[in-house]
């Protein structure tokens, strides 16, 4: 079957033909390629066409596709069984590894997705503080939990949905919205709801309104405000954790959160998530404390093995991050040169190996409102051209591109050669 035939038949059985909205290419005039396999930095579709992968499964595949050490660990565990719904030594192995190699994670709880990690972290913060309100930032996406679907990024922004039908007003009445990189907007909320705010949750490197790194002074001030008001600071590092640095964005900024959420890379390509932080807070979780959270598949041994194999490679090879940053710098410089040559207004935002090309006339894109001013039609034209030419980029202006360990100088040069023909 061709890609088109598979996609058309998929629409009969899955809403939009996909299991996550952005995969449907709603903003593009092409159908999505149906991916069959991957190797290193390359993907292959059902028709045998090859692509250089700059999406990396939306972040997890930093080590490239079919990483042999991950596959070997997984195969070994599969011989023992798929899952038991019981404690295993593998979940201890991964939990201990994260707690001993990542700053500010004294205890950790495994879950099954980034959404589950963030919603659980917020529940824990509310239980610990005995307060209800949270502050999130316009354009930040923390998963599809009801309380987060207010001015959210990712597919919500791509499809220009203000929220989501099915979310009762009561689910979001305790969600307060501030502007990313704007301290004053946060101070206003703390002044108004001084003793009611349980937590501030933020992506320190936003990746779901396009890549927008936080300003360091902004995060420093958030830390001060949370400390002064006895609120919990939650870093959503589902995307940036183990990616922009092994210890995550918190290590780049030198700002200490109370709780951190993880997913994507920590599962080695398998469904996984986790949240961790100070013992004092984490001990409020059941069975030690009153805050209840559970999961049948949490701590699955196959996933734990894949996660451990992935994180160990990243931790033991810090030069990987230097290499990815070097490639990112080359790609960024090349894109800006093309922009200058062709007279195409754009802004490149990058944090190490996360990047977005904003087709935007502004000098800087630092917030949700800045990102929304981008030319989405121009981005669609760019994405269609790149994808049909074998460069697999996100189909949305508001999603991140990723570089990984297996990308090469030749991959970067090919990207730039194709973009020059836009």
UniProtKB/Swiss-Prot annotation:
One annotated Gene Ontology cellular component of this protein: cytoplasm
Protein's UniProt keywords contain Protein biosynthesis: no
Domain of life: Bacteria
GO process terms (BP): protoporphyrinogen IX biosynthetic process
UniProt EC number: 5.4.3.8
Cofactor: pyridoxal 5'-phosphate
Entry-linked PROSITE patterns: AA_TRANSFER_CLASS_3 (PS00600)
SUPFAM superfamilies: PLP-dependent transferases
Enzyme class: isomerase
Annotated HAMAP family: HemL_aminotrans_3
Subunit structure: Homodimer.
Family to which this protein belongs: Belongs to the class-III pyridoxal-phosphate-dependent aminotransferase family. HemL subfamily.
Protein's recorded name: Glutamate-1-semialdehyde 2,1-aminomutase
Organism: Clostridium acetobutylicum (strain ATCC 824 / DSM 792 / JCM 1419 / IAM 19013 / LMG 5710 / NBRC 13948 / NRRL B-527 / VKM B-1787 / 2291 / W)
